[in-house]
């Protein structure tokens, strides 16, 4: 058994059991991936993948357990490489951040600017997806750090640290009837079509919970994957928007009325997610601290390496 075989097993699962896509992701040929996986299965004496002809259809029961171990091994191999690089080129390398649109668009620009000034020779990569994808990318060693609100804490291969709390605002065209409400209520919001985030994104669960607690069902006319889309369709009068507060920009969004909704919804917490026991390069710790100044490197290390 070797790390290459382990890497290919992870790549096949992470690419929807498409061997050809896994080969592209690993910069190799499809027959190479298939051969390495078959060799590994023969060495272990167990079948990792369910097959239909030459196609991989999913994991066997044993394969589920093998994949969990393979993810850990693949992560450890990544940590070894990071350790070697940190010893030889502490201020050069690649840092991959997995995050959502709201974080990438409205929160991270300040951090990226600060980081790039300190580490001009580190290449930053932003992988944008939903929180579940962000967690999977870090768990599978495709990203170093995940930044999101939902889902990160649910992945057993990750540890998370709280960074900051935030809430929501309601946005509407300037002459919309909702703007005449002196104090917003769930009852008032329930009268109108709503535009908000998809269920997998940006604290949507808190919104659903607030409506349910008040005994109302939200009339969700449209769900979106990012804040800019919500604002676009509010401008088209499709509905009123429930938006992450940091996504409202007073100058650019002056044509929309912003109404505070923090009294209606429980606050959400944005977290960083890291792979358990992962070796992080020094510049990765610096990025986290720039993003969340309340965190200290020693605190981060304690959480990462306590999870054994």
Predicted regions and their residues:
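N-terminal short secondary-structure element
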Residues: 1-31, 36
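Secondary-structure junction motif
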Residues: 178, 193-214, 279-290, 295-307
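Flexible hinge/capping segments at coil-to-helix
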Residues: 157-194
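Alpha-helical linker/hinge and terminal dimerization helices associated
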Residues: 43-44, 66-88
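Short beta-strand-centered segments that line the small-molecule binding cleft or hinge
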Residues: 87, 110-114, 132-168, 172, ...
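A short LG(V/I)-centered, amphipathic sequence patch enriched
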Residues: 41-61
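Beta-alpha-beta core module
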Residues: 155-161, 165-166, 228-277
